[in-house]
Amino acid sequence: MESFDIVVVGAGWYGLMAARTYLELAPETNLLIVDDSSTVGGVWSKERIYPSLFAQISHPLFEYSFYPMPKDDISPDGFVSGKTIHNYLTSFTRDHNLLPRLRLNTRVERVRRGPSDAGGWVLDIKEGNPLLCHKLIYATGANSSPIIPTWPRQTFEQPVIHSLDLGKHQDYIAKSVETATVVGRSKSSYDAVYHLLCEGKRVNWVMRDGLSGPFSLYAPTFMGLWNIADHISTRFASSFSPCIMNTSGFCYNFLQRNAVGRTLTNVYWRAANYLSVSHAEYWRTPNAEKLRPRPYSDGVFWGSGGIGIATAPDFWKVFHRGNITIHSTEIDSLSHGDVVNLKNGYSLATDIVIHCTGFDKGYTTFDPELREELGLQYNSKSISRWSLLDAKAEQTVDELLPYLRTAPLQDMDPDASSRPEQGPNRHFRRLVVPELAARGDRSILFPGHIHSAFTPLAAELQALWGVSWMLGWRELPPQEEMELEAATFNAWTRKRYLEQGKKHSYFIYDYIPYIDTLMRDLGLNPYRKSSVFEEWFVRYKPSDYGTILDEYRDIRRLSLECLQGTGGFAERTNGHGVNMK
């Protein structure tokens, strides 16, 4: 059994940044990164990208703060291609000397507690020897475990794949597919449909109907003038979203606590919804009308079916002129070589079936008992223990954010949030298990298990927050306070994002308050602009945070000097050499 100080599971945005940050602060650490793909990048690995795949964030917002992304293969509206992102993360791995610590094609089959005398964690590896580590950073992210429905099959011979593997099947699609069946209504379904239509294929798009509605898709620009991602990344825009992480200050008191302000908030979101609908022109065809966000008046606010941006400037033009039919039903069975049978009684011939059904939480590597201990799954005992906290959290959200009291009714089971497969993690700051942290156990961290479009910056802040805690440099609040924070966040995201919030730590519009929260925890100044005007109306981008690691080192150094009076610049913490320079 090989032994390491740290094992990072996942070589995407979050895993690579966690590894780099740990080695920056504790360079003598014996650290290993494992990933089951053959290349780095996670969802942006080489095998998962294809030509028409673009990130939903514009170029200057989709990079690490200290490592600029090249302006290669950028869309007319400024969005970054999958190829550029993959090359960027590959270069980052090389330039930060992570390649010698990287082990690809390594699938973790099971995670369990280490031997009682050694502690830590044991990772059972498929077709390899187990790994023992003192600490584990589980950075598989929110898009690593594909949901693949199963249906009765009789002599069905055509490929059935997940959108995860669309890049691997490009040659087959180009040469052998005339008609494709796309299943689901997540953002990946829009990407797959666009790609297929651009390839000249006929598409049958199958999506179940429901009150939550389809994915809410923004226009790529605001009236053709301003990239919509740039607008969302301003404090001005962020202040219009009722957020439990932003409950103080003039804008909060006016826009969320004042009747006139809430009216303006409502006008803002209805205007955003109108611009989105006008750009898409849902009324042009019955097919398009089926994609209209719900509720019709402000569907882009609630985002119950998910929220994203049409990164291809001609998405709706391609859709409206494409050979496509939307079926508001579900698949019943597959049969007769190439036939898809629908629950509404219709049958379709197809050359391929593509699941765009999203991703589940990648926690099956943990045994059920361990999932419960780590706040990844709820059982009847934990539900009972948390019921009072949940009730208190619901009351707090209703009191602080009255705008959310009138959420539209959903078709989802009201108790779905208490199902293991549905509930968000019960983690403090979406990173730490409260019960373990209260016991002084700093051996496991869960970065990346959130849904926020501004991935690189979130990865950077989560890494610094988490690594500094794992090294023992910061103390956390009492267990009761951490559990209440987790319960309150989960109550808020359920009310704010409805179906999405019942399943995930979802905060697409609210990344700035989350970054602010982590910055304050670290003792760093969250306000990075040079004037009040820029602070509120100029987009926040990763480069605004380019010095946070040095700033935190300075804070740590001053703290040590005050406590020790030695003027030292280094210390030993948790067995690792620590770099304070």
Curated annotation (Swiss-Prot):
It comes from the Eukaryota. Pathway: Polyketide biosynthesis. One of its GO terms (molecular function) is monooxygenase activity. InterPro entries: FAD/NAD-bd_sf, FMO-like. Keywords: FAD, Flavoprotein, Monooxygenase, NADP, Oxidoreductase. Induction: Expression is positively regulated by the depudecin biosynthesis cluster-specific transcription activator DEP6. FAD binds at V43, W44, S45, K46, V108, M470. It holds the Pfam family Pyr_redox_3. NADP(+) binds at residues 54-56, 183-202, 219-220, 351-352. It is an enzyme of class 1 (oxidoreductase). Its cofactor is FAD. Its EC number is 1.-.-.-. Disruption phenotype: Impairs the production of depudecin and accumulates an epoxide-containing metabolite of slightly higher retention factor than native depudecin. PANTHER family: DIMETHYLANILINE MONOOXYGENASE. Belongs to the FAD-binding monooxygenase family. FAD-dependent monooxygenase; part of the gene cluster that mediates the biosynthesis of depudecin, a highly oxidized eleven-carbon linear polyketide that acts as a histone deacetylase (HDAC) inhibitor and makes a small contribution to pathogenesis. The reducing polyketide synthase DEP5 is the central enzyme in depudecin biosynthesis by yielding the backbone polyketide chain. The monooxygenases DEP2 and DEP4, as well as the uncharacterized protein DEP1, then act as tailoring enzymes to modify the intermediate polyketide chain into depudecin. This is FAD-dependent monooxygenase DEP4. It comes from Alternaria brassicicola (Dark leaf spot agent). The gene is DEP4.
